Amino acid sequence: VSVPFPEPTEHVSTRTEVYLRYLAYFRDGVGRRVEAMTEDEARRSRVPSGWTPRELVRHLTFMERRWFVWGFEGTPVDDPHGDEVDGRWVVPDEVGTADVLAAWRRQAEVTEAVVRRHDLDEVGRPSERWDGEPPATLERVLLHVVQEYARHLGQLDVVAELGGGVTGEV
């Protein structure tokens, strides 16, 4: 069952719920597209920059860790940029796409727990994530992550369409 698009007129009790619903919608789109691919399709790049769908999912996993755990909560994490080598997304060959998706889903649960523990106006803790800048509020972090998901889902739509897979609002 797919997550419905959160309509602007839909009654939602809090701003936090609005952000979490949009995030769930975009996550659902990413998951359904990659789950519909064969292992070979998920490992295949169809774009000049060379990324694969499974690399995109792993990037999203690490991106959420960087913003919510390492950044906002200020909790040290092992290898916060473990999704990249020389600026390019990577997944070790021996790691299957199902494992990449499972790690992404676990991180989504962590992210939701972080968001629910804090108020949107709360400012993150100082950490290396902020690169010397003052930490952002949780709302700004959420907005950034929602837009990153929307952008990457659009990119994944193109890749899925080129491979004859699931696209659009389905």
Locations of the language-model features?
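Acidic/histidine-rich alpha-helical segments that form the ligand environment
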Residues: G87-P126, E139-V145
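Active-site rim elements
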Residues: S13-Y19, T97-L101
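Short, contiguous alpha-helical
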Residues: S2-T9, T16-G87, S127-V170
